[in-house]
Structure formats: C-alpha cells, structure tokens
Amino acid sequence: MPAAFFVVRAIVTDPGKRAAFDRWYEREHVPDAVKAFGVSKAWRFWSLDDPSLHQAMYQFDDEAKLAAMLKGDALNQLVADFNRDWPDVRRSRETLVLAQEFAK
C-alpha cells in the first residue's frame, strides 16, 4: 500500500505573528501531532511565493492509518488547540495518496 499524507495549509496574514506561529508549530504542534497521529514523518514549509502561507505535511504508512486518524479524537484535540491559540489563522486540510516516488 502506498503512503498517504495529511496536509494542513494555514494563512498567517499578520506578518507580526508569523515568528510566534512558527515557534508554536515547531515546539508544540508538530511534536504533539506526530505523537498523536503515530506518523513516520512530518514536514513544515513556508511558501517562497506567498510569505503568509504555511504548510504542514504528515506521512502515514497507508490510507487505512490516515482514515483511522481522521475518525479519531486526536485530530479533534489538535484542531481545538489550534483554534484556541490561533483563532484568526485560516486553514484548509487535504488528504493525498502517493502516486509515484522518484529518487536518484
């Protein structure tokens, strides 16, 4: 089974809040999410084209593990934490399945 991914895109419109958001994500949110989701890898990105755009990606072993996480309580708790700490940050979520991987 191919790997599956959970992607969260956040728009941090206030430039003055981006450093605090970045620290919170690095020190609290990603470690909590990795532990709660039981994922094998996680990444975070800031867009080079749009400085307000932050993206986090979590890799699951397969679609079944991603689907189980989406139905579980861990996601609800992490969403509640995000809403509490960053109520003005809009975000969207997407689920993906690996179609191809190329490595040289």
Predicted regions and their residues:
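Macromolecular interaction modules
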Residues: 1-104
